[in-house]
Amino acid sequence: MINNVISPEFDENGRALRRVRSFVRRQGRLTNRQQQALDNLWPKIGVEYQAEKLELGALFGREAPVVLEIGFGMGASLVTMASQNPEKDFLGIEVHVPGVGACLASAEDENIGNLRVMCHDAIEVLENMIPDNRLEMVQLFFPDPWHKVRHNKRRIVQPPFAELIKSKLKVGGVFHMATDWQPYAEHMLEVMNGVDNYLNLSENGDYVPRPSSRPITKFELRGQRLGHGVWDIMFKRIK
């Protein structure tokens, strides 16, 4: 596994550019299980970053609908969805190395064959590796809300990001977001409503009930017990 999660960007004169990123790089401490999974399973399930388009059919060994999840955490929900939907292929992106290791280990436990994972900046993967008009769904569950106003620009859901996601979705494909921070949910709605050729799937023009396709995480269950809300937002590409 190549540890090159953050790639540099340069201007035409070769000077490094500072890029505002939506995540904080946290290496964390690996458990033995996570390290073993990275050592043994990354060559089978992991996908190295490269600045060229993926052949998704070749990657999974078949032609099937592809779901992309950005920021899968420890991978519990992603592995569950892959297990419950064997007719679909799942590609997960996560920058937290212990989370990648945990996801790989869980995938092996469940004997999952329709899952591949990457450890790299999702924006660069989308821009350089994901073919246009190819994805059935993009999932973004509980991204960092960057609570402080001065950090709001770091939120991943911004108009250019929404446009980028749209270009990777098939017509009819869906961008599904979820957050437990209401101001971020409102921000997501504002951004998505401002981008052409998306249709909000909410009957009321705001949020949708949690679809059964999105598993409830332990974190979410704990929040529910404490009275915290969760907002699901789903927009379909219509053109």
UniProtKB/Swiss-Prot annotation:
Keyword line: Methyltransferase, S-adenosyl-L-methionine, Transferase, tRNA processing
UniProt region (Interaction with RNA), positions on chain: 150-155
UniProt GO MF annotations: tRNA (guanine(46)-N7)-methyltransferase activity
Active site residues according to the UniProt entry: 144
Binding site for S-adenosyl-L-methionine: 69, 94, 121, 144
Annotated positions binding substrate: 148, 180, 217-220
UniProt pathway annotation: tRNA modification; N(7)-methylguanine-tRNA biosynthesis
Function text: Catalyzes the formation of N(7)-methylguanine at position 46 (m7G46) in tRNA.
Subunit structure as annotated in this protein's UniProt entry: Monomer.
Similarity section: Belongs to the class I-like SAM-binding methyltransferase superfamily. TrmB family.
Name of the featured protein: tRNA (guanine-N(7)-)-methyltransferase
Species for this entry: Photorhabdus laumondii subsp. laumondii (strain DSM 15139 / CIP 105565 / TT01) (Photorhabdus luminescens subsp. laumondii)
Organism classification: Bacteria, Pseudomonadati, Pseudomonadota, Gammaproteobacteria, Enterobacterales
Gene that specifies this protein: trmB
